[in-house]
Amino acid sequence: MTASKDRENFVYIAKLAEQAERYEEMVESMKNVANLDVELTVEERNLLSVGYKNVIGARRASWRILSSIEQKEETKGNELNAKRIKEYRQKVELELSNICNDVMRVIDEHLIPSAAAGESTVFYYKMKGDYYRYLAEFKSGNEKKEAADQSMKAYESATAAAEADLPPTHPIRLGLALNFSVFYYEILNSPERACHLAKQAFDEAISELDTLNEESYKDSTLIMQLLRDNLTLWTSDIPEDGEDAQKVNGTAKLGGGEDAE
């Protein structure tokens, strides 16, 4: 089978797997495409992203539920149950780590080296920022700091590329601003910086809304709505003296904002 036939086959299987909600297989199929070291089409890029988003999303939801139950058991003083939950939670954390590390490897070894400047580059650096952010959600100590630093670096690279190559109304640029602001709010506990970034992205897009083509109008306005929802939610968290709020009792906020695909 030729490389182009292989590619066609992998993409078709990935679409089938998505329909069947078999996201691990969807990811495997799209990793096969990435391994060909070719520039992915928009459709292929989205298939890869959706597959990974579902694979990681299920574990992130599990982790949040387990953390919440663990907290309740600790509050009640049920040490044995808390210990059981902790062990189970750590199993989920290992899965999360493996998925995130897998994403980074595919991005660094195949996707970024094969990407053209512009949209693709922004997309992959944003994706890298997202998956380091997911690591920072559950890591602690130096590992958390390292994941947060890497996430920041990736988001900054994505932002520099987006500002150079994409208009403020572009859905990928808006999605990047949305997720980067969630990073500031949830990981760095900086509601003020989160709001500044979200508001700037929203205002810049509003001023150029009339330039939006019909194709991306729906996507862009949906993300703008999420930016506005998060701004409303976060503004109440900014202390009156203007300083960023620190973590309450050292615990990170869970589910502090909406993020994009």
Swiss-Prot record:
Disordered as annotated region, ranges: 238-261
Organism whose genome encodes this protein: Glycine max (Soybean)
Source superkingdom: Eukaryota
Name by which UniProt lists this protein: 14-3-3-like protein D
GO CC annotation terms, alphabetical: cytoplasm
GO BP terms: protein localization; signal transduction
PROSITE patterns: 1433_1, 1433_2
Family: Belongs to the 14-3-3 family.
